[in-house]
Design a protein with these regions (language model features):
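Intrinsic-disorder-linked linear interaction elements in eukaryotic regulatory proteins
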Residues: 3, 96-98
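Structural signature of tandem alpha-helical TPR/SEL1-like repeats
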Residues: 2-9, 36-45, 71-81
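Short helix-capping/linker turns of helical repeat alpha-solenoids
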Residues: 15-18, 31-33, 38, 51-55, ...
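Alpha-helical tetratricopeptide repeat
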Residues: 7-11, 19-27, 59
Length: 107
């Protein structure tokens, strides 16, 4: 019941454009917490929040793209998303970004 209420409140704020609420919805859909699991909807809300610079949504959208959970992004977009997340202190984003650059430099 409380999860339902929280989801509906977050949904209202997400539709109003609040990136934290958009991120919460993305997490809920990704995990199936209080709502039916839906990776497409998760990526939709992560994309909305990432578009406003939300670091965790940027990371989640980049990872979702790498795992083919969402449609492909423009070339270099994954790196941009990871850079946003890394600039906000997400160690996982920095490590993944380094791994991507290393893999490109292999013969």
């Amino acid at each position: 019941m409380i999860l339902d209420f929280h989801f509906h409140v977050a949904h209202v704020y997400a539709r109003l454009g609040y990136p934290n609420a958009q991120h919460i919805l993305g997490q809920r859909y990704l995990q199936g917490a209080g709502v039916e699991k839906n990776e497409d909807m998760a990526m939709h809300w992560f994309r909305q929040a990432a578009g406003q610079g939300h670091p965790h949504s940027s990371f989640n959208l980049a990872v979702g793209t790498l795992r083919n959970m969402t449609m492909a992004l423009e070339e270099g977009e994954v790196e941009k998303l990871l850079s946003v997340a890394a600039a906000h202190g997400l160690l996982e984003a920095q490590q993944l970004l380094e791994n991507i650059f290393k893999s490109r430099n292999l013969p």
